[in-house]
Amino acid sequence: MDHSNREKDDRQRTTKTMAQRNTHCSRPSGTSTSSGVLMVGPNFRVGKKIGCGNFGELRLGKNLYTNEYVAIKLEPIKSRAPQLHLEYRFYKQLGSAGEGLPQVYYFGPCGKYNAMVLELLGPSLEDLFDLCDRTFTLKTVLMIAIQLLSRMEYVHSKNLIYRDVKPENFLIGRQGNKKEHVIHIIDFGLAKEYIDPETKKHIPYREHKSLTGTARYMSINTHLGKEQSRRDDLEALGHMFMYFLRGSLPWQGLKADTLKERYQKIGDTKRSTPIEALCENFPEEMMTYLRYVRRLDFFEKPDYEYLRNLFTDLFERKGYTFDYAYDWVGRPIPTPVGSVHVDSGASAITRESHTHRDRPSQQQPLRNQPRSLTAEWFVLAPLSHPPAPT
């Protein structure tokens, strides 16, 4: 389920990561200059460690030619189930034309590691949710939702399903950058081609699949062991939107003796929670969205424009202006290269062996072991305050 085989809340796991990340990562040995500076490729200097997990570690880096900061993801070459090259391949498949995707600058060996150099982004929606006292206004959620429907439509247009919806995987741009207001989608380690590249046909419907995704947000059909398709990404987004509006979901914090029992309880609670109850006291459009995506057929192409219009029409009816004045605008946001105060004016201008996770599972054997952090979240903007318990 999460990149973790231990059933813990996302925030609990992240807390543990912060305490342990300096002891569980081996030191990568890459190309060093005569002065001992570690390099990736010809021009990326490897800096401080800002995250780690079973995949390897994450480093802040710098492009010595442009003086720009970057994120460097390192994975041992001898990993039993390497995923970094697959993720790189998916990024290349997605291309650089789509809005809200990090640029990938380099992939190649770095001593005993493979390295992927990515655009350095800002904090995740989970970080920003914490910063805003764990509640977002309807305006902010709608601005997020409208963008993420376009992100997911683009991913699907490239014959990929994402299968990893969670707030930690959606990041804003770096402050001061022209894309600072754009919600980006990252971490394609669990993505999958739903169109067979050989036959050009949709993958077949299957059952008895192991869980892939994050339990809190994944679709009901994923809990039931059904093969995922485009509909499941959209349902998971709907659950995340309600998480932002409500502050929590009814299936959070359930207790059980085993992981399997807990995941079963989460799925059972999702199925038994009427959409009307989940969306109570919120606009009817939230119910309409969830009803629509849950009724989609496995092979069916969602009507993304219909869903976007649900939210844009509501947005306009409420009299909102799409000015990117999110709830976090005006609050200081720590980043790996210093704390930045978000100015409101400036902001307005502008693979098949995964098992369970309540953050995503990472491997088999690697993907099914605990991954102790949300990868780029730490790279791109580790907040200094500890997560609150849930």
From Swiss-Prot:
Major localization listed first in the record, in broad terms: cytoplasm
Reactions performed catalytically: L-seryl-[protein] + ATP = O-phospho-L-seryl-[protein] + ADP + H(+); L-threonyl-[protein] + ATP = O-phospho-L-threonyl-[protein] + ADP + H(+)
MF terms (GO), sorted A to Z: ATP binding; protein serine kinase activity; protein serine/threonine kinase activity
Presence of keyword Nucleotide-binding: yes
Sorted UniProt keywords: ATP-binding, Cytoplasm, Kinase, Nucleotide-binding, Phosphoprotein, Serine/threonine-protein kinase, Transferase, Wnt signaling pathway
EC number(s) per entry: 2.7.11.1
Assigned GO CC terms: cytoplasm; nucleus; plasma membrane
Region annotation Disordered: where it falls in the sequence: 1-34
Enzyme class: transferase
Record field: compositional bias (Basic and acidic residues): 1-13
GO biological process: endocytosis; positive regulation of canonical Wnt signaling pathway; signal transduction; Wnt signaling pathway
Domain Protein kinase, first and last residues per copy: 44-315
Residues the entry annotates as binding ATP: 50-58, 73
Database matches in Pfam families: CK1gamma_C, Pkinase
InterPro entries: Casein_kinase-1_gamma_C, CK1_Ser-Thr_kinase, Kinase-like_dom_sf, Prot_kinase_dom, Protein_kinase_ATP_BS, Ser/Thr_kinase_AS
Presence of the UniProt keyword Phosphoprotein in the record: yes
UniProt feature, compositional bias: Polar residues: 15-34
Positions carrying Phosphoserine: 344
Active site: 164
Post-translational modification: Autophosphorylated.
Location in or out of the cell: Cytoplasm
Family, per entry: Belongs to the protein kinase superfamily. CK1 Ser/Thr protein kinase family. Casein kinase I subfamily.
Description of how the protein assembles with itself and partners: Monomer.
Role played: Serine/threonine-protein kinase. Casein kinases are operationally defined by their preferential utilization of acidic proteins such as caseins as substrates. It can phosphorylate a large number of proteins. Participates in Wnt signaling. Regulates fast synaptic transmission mediated by glutamate. Phosphorylates CLSPN.
UniProt protein name: Casein kinase I isoform gamma-1
